[in-house]
């Protein structure tokens, strides 16, 4: 992995599993698959000494990598059996569900029209993506961005019924909106920041148009990795994640690297989460070297 912070790009050697896809995409008549919408949430907190086993005090990668106040972000390692990017270390997230569009869901924060303007999409798409972001972070790490009113969030999720709801959501047995309505809760979209928009490369057979959100870890709640999609989960600093990726210990994707640089550039978690920028979609593309090796290059979007 080669990161150019000054030029704003990252370049990886293409994994063997995708080389055949790249070669197929270069053939005449190739038509890329239409991407599906997805949402990802970077759950962050301000770190403190000895808060996690992954804490590192110095020796960061790369030398000029910004560290701010050493924010921590919650990351998951996907199980090896996943069809899409198995074993990758990612932020909680997933595909938008058709049932994420319920207009009756009590909603607090920017209206769908405001999100749509920033995201460059329709109001319906914006609504579904924002709801999917909140649903996925609850499904995958047990963090609920909702409360009884616009000024609070649920703090105690220890009752077994919450885990039952998570399982039902993961199995598509209940809609997230229905769960919140039944519990008399309001979706707190004001707790979400909007950071970036990445589209899966055109050579992939599964493609996602993914919006990356941020959220401050709610007080009183505990993030976990109790999902069938993750091998392990924990809080890490961006510098640690970058170092693990460079060493080859972690599989990091281009959007993950870009978003880690965004987190590290923030002075604190609150500042990072308050960011809502108008987005420019970015994507990786293959480059064939003289020796026949394929590299995946990604130019980072300019931050507005």
Predicted regions and their residues:
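N-terminal leader/linker segments that precede catalytic domains of diphosphate-processing enzymes
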Residues: 1-304
């Amino acid at each position: 992995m080669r990161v150019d912070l000054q030029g704003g790009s990252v370049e990886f050697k293409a994994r063997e599993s995708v080389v055949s896809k790249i070669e197929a995409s270069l053939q005449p008549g190739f038509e890329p698959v239409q991407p599906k919408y997805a949402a990802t949430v970077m759950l962050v907190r301000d770190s403190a000494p000895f808060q996690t086993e992954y804490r590192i005090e110095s020796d960061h990668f790369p030398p000029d990598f910004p560290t701010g106040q050493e924010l921590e972000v919650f990351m998951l390692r996907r199980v090896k059996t996943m069809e899409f990017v198995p074993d990758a270390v990612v932020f909680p997230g997933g595909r938008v569900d058709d049932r994420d569009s319920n207009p009756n869901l009590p909603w607090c924060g920017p209206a769908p029209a405001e999100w749509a303007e920033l995201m460059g999409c329709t109001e319906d798409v914006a609504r579904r993506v924002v709801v999917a972001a909140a649903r996925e972070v609850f499904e995958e790490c047990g963090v609920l961005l909702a409360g009884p009113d616009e000024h609070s969030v649920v703090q105690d999720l220890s009752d077994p019924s919450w885990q039952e709801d998570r399982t039902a959501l993961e199995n598509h047995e209940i809609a997230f909106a229905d769960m919140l309505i039944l519990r008399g809760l309001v979706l707190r979209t004001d707790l979400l920041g909007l950071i970036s928009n990445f589209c899966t490369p055109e050579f992939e057979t599964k493609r996602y148009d993914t919006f990356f959100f941020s959220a401050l870890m709610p007080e009183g709640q505990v993030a976990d990795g109790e999902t069938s999609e993750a091998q392990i989960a924990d809080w890490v600093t961006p510098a640690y994640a970058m170092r693990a990726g460079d060493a080859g210990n972690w599989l990091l994707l281009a959007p993950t690297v870009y978003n880690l640089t965004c987190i590290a550039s923030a002075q604190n978690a609150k500042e990072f989460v308050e960011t809502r920028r108008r987005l420019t979609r970015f994507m990786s593309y293959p480059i064939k070297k003289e020796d026949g090796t394929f590299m995946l290059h990604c130019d980072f979007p300019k931050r507005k």
